[in-house]
Amino acid sequence: MAVITMKQLLNTLFVTSEDIYLSLEGENVLANRDKTVVARYPLHTLQAIISFSYAGASPALMGKCAEAGIGLAFCSPHGRFLARTCGESSGNVLLRREQYRIADDPARSCEIARTMIFGKLSNGAASIQRTLRDHAPRVADCGLEKAAANLRAMLPQVLAAADLDSLRGIEGAAATAYFDVLDHMLLSRKEAFFFHGRSRRPPLDRVNAMLSFAYSLLAHDCASALESVGLDSYVGFLHRDRPGRQSLALDLMEELRPCMADRFVLTLVNNRMLRPEDFQMQDSGAVLLSDDGRRKFLKTWQERKQDTLTHPYLGEKLSWGMIPYAQALLLARCLRADLDGYPPFLWK
């Protein structure tokens, strides 16, 4: 059972317990557990419902939501998007049309992409600062302070980037500065867990294998979040269209990489939660998680998503697993012009 059963956020009801069945009573949505009503919410206060429960919802509620223009989305308990219900006309049509218009306008795309990359650099610096704070004696002379300062110094450049190509150049320089010191943030069993640069296809060491797997899981969660709020995960602003690539999911995950994926991998290594034996060395030089290692990784990833924090913009206590959904909601509100701009997730 999830830590939080129900959470109303930005006029969206999140059902995060997997044994909750949703039904309709008059103009109210009822949350039922074992045929007992545990909560009720007036439908007129909601714009959307996102359920992470396999128990489902009544046809009457689905019909009422479709009639009232309330988005009803279903995800697995682990966050995989399954389906949405909508009526004959839906605000999602207007939302997606605006998304496509912005994606076709480089200047407007850059405006949103700037804030996402601002979040990525800010969170990268925060991750480095956390290592400095938690392990000060061991990492005092490793260049971490300088790297964090360099990332922070690039933040004004990000906001001033004139176009997407300039923004990508700044992001690339920041990624180099960040990954140059990542090895100094790995503090356990250095003979097995080291990082000498990013290698993707295939990953060539254990840390790159974990980073690639974490990024894949995070991209999946971001895509599910975007689809659940009615956005097209394949049409991005920073990452341009490419067949089969969920470009908007890649956009959204940029600001979340340092705090949700990279910090997770650092925790696995520094807390000795995975062993060197949990990886397989291929004849091609690729390094992959073994079946047992993948199971451990996934179990710990899902546990991490249940940890809670206070969202820095919303001021609400949320689980880490809800952060992509909160950001997807904020992005949708930005595209609808309910917000002056997109507020990135800024970790502290």
Each predicted region: which residue ranges?
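Active-site helix-to-loop segments that bind/position phosphate- or nucleotide-bearing substrates
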Residues: A2-E25, D34, R40, N92-K348
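A surface-exposed, charged beta-strand/loop segment in the N-terminal or early-internal portion
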Residues: T45, S53-A126
